[in-house]
Amino acid sequence: MTLDQVLTYKETLHENRIKISSIGSPIGKISIEDPFEEHLALFKHVLDVAVAFESPYVRMFSFFIPEGKPADDFHEEVVKRWNQFLEVAKDYPQITLLHENEKDIYGDIPEHCAKLLTELNNPQVKSAFDPANFVQCDVEVYPHAYELLKDEIGYMHIKDAHFADHKVTPAGLGDGQVEAVLRALVANGFTGFAALEKEGISIEETKSDGEKLFTVASNALKKILVENMGQEWN
């Protein structure tokens, strides 16, 4: 996406009173063994896009680990590359970098996420906490993953999944303990965003209808927040 395109899209969004909370970037979604210089240049462009959209967050990853190799063997290289991201990002202090736990990257389990964030020790980096992705890595989301990352969570992804087959479901219909996480976040004073995701949800009656899938996902979240937790829905 060019910056000229961004300005066009931004005008349309403004006309419809829509704002962008986060840029869902592909940064860090390459192999840890891939060349890095071009990717670092792309990262700067993503930051420029975020500025143009007035988005306070950029979602990122911590690199795919080669199959069959221990993720811990690449910890130092992951930290090195993220520190290079932060060196660029310091010129964009209004933007927070979000590390998403994604299957098969370095930070796909909470222990690695916590280790990375602790070593970076930078307030410009937070966790984008995704319950479904943890389930797909056979990780207990609550209390285990939440307790390890609760002080670093800056953004929530709302989707769920089953341990048995790793299929994604609407919130509350899987094993991701989404309601327990949301209750804990509220109790902990969380004031960030929650991004509702329909991607990956497989429900026969909706087939590939994106609008229907979003409605299903939205209704599932509304049930948790309004009916179960007594929160407002505006």
Q: Where on the chain are the PLM-derived regions?
A:
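N-terminal substrate-binding region of glycoside hydrolase catalytic domains
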Residues: M1, G24-I27
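Aromatic- and glycine-enriched glycan-recognition loops and surfaces
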Residues: M1-L7
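Short, conserved glycine- and acidic-residue-centered signature motifs
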Residues: T2, H39, F74, V78, ...
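Active-site acidic/histidine proton-transfer and metal-coordination neighborhood
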Residues: L7, T12-E15, K29-S127, Q136, ...
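Short phosphate-binding/catalytic loops that engage adenosine nucleotides
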Residues: I18, I95, F190
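Conserved beta-strand positions in the central sheet of alpha/beta enzyme cores
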Residues: S22-G24, R59, L98, G154-H157, ...
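Histidine-acidic metal/acid-base catalytic patches
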Residues: E54, P110-F129, V135-N234
